[in-house]
Amino acid sequence: QACQEAGVDAFGGPDRAHDSFTNIQKAINYSMTSFFTTGGIRGQKQSMEKFHPRSFNMGFSQEVLKATGGFSGLRFGEDIDMSIRIMAAGFKTCLLPEAYVFHKRRTSFRKFFKQVYNSGMARINLYLLHPHSLKLVHFLPACFVIGCLLCLLGGIFFSWYCLLPLLLLIFVFFIDSWRLNKSIKVAFLSIV
């Protein structure tokens, strides 16, 4: 029904954190959905990349299923692979902001870091399957880590002024998370 109403063949919606989620889950949700941390690629109205529905909240027509053969056997990144194949087959996708789901996140930072690692491996596999799918936005996490390391090294070996960009980012993440989650504790956890 959503496909017919929106005039598209596949759709997806954003994910949200339910009030009952733990503070760590809310902080992880912030890191996975904030425009500042993901470029808006995970279900935001403003995005640096064309919207790709994710399997946690994806719907598609029977024609899409027949044309694509459904999900591939990938262990990680199978949802992005499906979205790429949907678009490559000429079908249209859209974000339905009102079709949100409460996406329960990992319960510890250790489990979250493992998930992020697996997502990075999935991006490599997706590039091998679909070389055209690699976009500038996918390099931002690596650039962020390198930038943080350079700021820290500059602060240690040159001047504390080198830490200012890092401190500014921490401040922006903290304020944005506090604004969205209305919790100082979640805001502190969001900068971990």
Q: What does each model-found stretch correspond to?
A:
Residues I28-M32, F112-K114:
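Short, hinge-like loop/turn segments at secondary-structure boundaries
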Residues S72-L134:
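Catalytic donor/gating beta->alpha subdomain of glycosyltransferases that bind UDP-sugars
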Residues A122, H132-H138, F144, C148:
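Anionic, Ser/Thr-rich low-complexity intrinsically disordered regions
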Residues F144-V192:
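Membrane-embedded multi-pass helical conduit in multi-pass membrane proteins
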